[in-house]
Amino acid sequence: QQEAAVAYQQTVLKAWHEIDDALSSYTAERQRNAQLAAMEVASRDAWELARVRYQHGMTDFLVALDAQRTLLQAQRAHAESNARLALGLVAVTKALGAQPAPEPAA
């Protein structure tokens, strides 16, 4: 009986660690995602400015092209973070013991 109690306690502690790890990862990714969203907005503003400056002959095409490249990199990083957020939410849900939602009827 004591062995069963110890095994149960170990199982509960393992579950708590899994929940804590999943929540920590998810929280960190949420913070990173917010930073990446801000970087995307700043990159979009920089690209718009570079594009307008190029259209008015105030800068060369390479400056506008570099700003666009930076924007695309920021968008990609933000999209990848969005995917990690979704996976992190799945990990939290699984750690909490929730069952996946059933497939809708066709």
Enumerate the predicted regions with their spans.
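Amphipathic alpha-helical coiled-coil segments
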Residues: 1-77, 84-95
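Amphipathic alpha-helical coiled-coil scaffold segments and their short linker/junction regions
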Residues: 101-106
